[in-house]
Structures are given as C-alpha cells and as structure tokens.
Amino acid sequence: MHALYKQAAALTEEVIAAAVMVQKHFGIGALESIYVRCLERELELAGHKTSREKVIKINYRGMQFKENLRYDLLIDDCLLIEAKSCEKENMDIWRMQLLTYMKLMDKPLGLVINFGNEHLPTRGVKRVILKGADEETVSF
C-alpha cells in the first residue's frame, strides 16, 4: 500500500463536502479558477496545507530536466484535485490528466471535481487511484 494512501483516502469526504459548499455559494457557471481558490480557502480554514504548483524532476533515457506542473490543488501533500467547471463532461480525459500528475508526483489518490455538474457529490466527483496504491503488500 502506498505510504500516503490512507491519509489521502481519509481526506476525500471532507474535500467533497467543501466542494459542495463552494458550489452552493457560487452555483453552476463560475470560472474554474474561482472554484479552486475558494475550495483552497475552505480547506485552509479547516487546517489543511495546500499548494497549486510544483517543480519536479523528470528522468528520461539519461536526460534529466525540471518541469513546472500546474495542477489545480494538492492537499496535505497526499491528495491531488483536478477541478473543472463544464456542463459537458470529458471524465475520461480529465481522469487521465489527473493520473499523469499523480504518477509524476507519486501521489496515491486524486479527485476529479466538476463544479459544472449540478449533482456534484454523486455524479460530479470521480476518485482516481494510482495503480497498486490501495493494495496491501504481503511479505513471506
């Protein structure tokens, strides 16, 4: 099991509740950046550490370079958020985008949150789990 998986999983309900609160305040149709900043504020008020950008090292065939990742939100260094504000959903594309960030940053769990979906808690949120992050390892 990924070292941060349980911590990230424990945060998901709180993050979804905060997202619902933000969506109720602004309704559907606000800019994605507004939703993200307000979600970040809700989580900071609840005592969580947040960030929205990180420089990471990429290694490829003997070449090493730094890349600036502009993910939407990272909470307590373990849960990644990909926020959207669209009526038409492209959930597969959004999940792949989030999964790419999760792999590059070695984060076990992420949430795609579509503030444009009026049924946010049930149909507007998708969990994305890094392969193997939620599995127990058995040693013999």
For the regions a language model picked out, list residue spans one by one.
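Solvent-exposed, charged helical/coil patches
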Residues: 1-49, 126-134, 138-140
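Conserved catalytic cores of phosphodiester-cleaving nucleases, focusing on short active-site segments
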Residues: 27, 71-87, 101
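Amphipathic alpha-helical interface surfaces
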Residues: 35, 39, 76, 94-97
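Short secondary-structure capping/turn micro-motifs that flank functional sites
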Residues: 39, 59-60, 118
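Short Asp/Glu-rich motifs
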Residues: 42, 62-63, 121
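A short acidic/basic microdomain associated with nuclease active sites
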Residues: 44-61
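A short, glycine/Asx- and small/polar-enriched loop/turn
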Residues: 64-69
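Nucleic-acid nuclease catalytic cores
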Residues: 84-137
